Amino acid sequence: MKEFSLDTSYLYGHACHTIDQVLSFFGRPDHIHYDVRQLLGTNRMNDYFDLDLYYGSTKVSVKSSYFRIKERPSFVVYGKKGMFVKATKDRQEEDLKKFYLPNHPDFGLDLPEHYGVLTYVDENGVYHEEKVVSEVGDYSRVYQALHDSIVLGKEKLIQDQETILQIEILEEGIRQMKEKIGRAHV
């Protein structure tokens, strides 16, 4: 990208998916810390973001960089006695990119090598590491619900305030990035 544009923004194009998931699981955060950068320089695309969404004592981080040699895990969850790591993304997108369509019974299904890994110490102090079978995703439910809302007048699956909150979060990230750049040039 030669110059910054919202419609090609790395934050808008990539963080939006994960922020959507976080908001659907946790709701409106109490507080958000934004770190959105243009590593290629001013007026170029924002190519790095690190957003920390706080929910009481829980912190959810959404981060990525255009400049990474390896992909980050999709999810890492830390607890007091263990952690869960899901390294790979939902298979639906990968299947669609290969024109492997939803009419196949195994569309979007993770193979064992894609499962998350739960590592923990139990109440007896014994270490465990086990694979966790992935939930089956289904993008088509969202599109069907959108159709049913528009055509049949059914209640929306995704409420307006959820979409507005996501846009507000993305816009605030861009605003803070631009504000930081403005202070650097004063």
Question: Residues of each region from the PLM?
Answer:
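A broad structural signal for alpha-helix termini and local helix breaks/kinks
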Residues: 25-27, 55, 150
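Generic structural signal for secondary-structure transition and capping sites
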Residues: 27-31, 58-59, 82, 155, ...
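Short amphipathic alpha-helical segments at helix-loop
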Residues: 2-7, 127, 131, 155
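C-terminal helix-rich "cap/oligomerization" subdomain common to oxidoreductases
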Residues: 130-185
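NAD(P)-dinucleotide binding in Rossmann-like oxidoreductases
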Residues: 39-46, 58-141, 159
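Hydrophobic alpha-helical segments typical of transmembrane helices
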Residues: 17-21, 116, 142-146
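Predominantly a Rossmann-like dinucleotide-binding segment in NAD(P)-dependent oxidoreductases
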Residues: 1-35, 39-42, 180
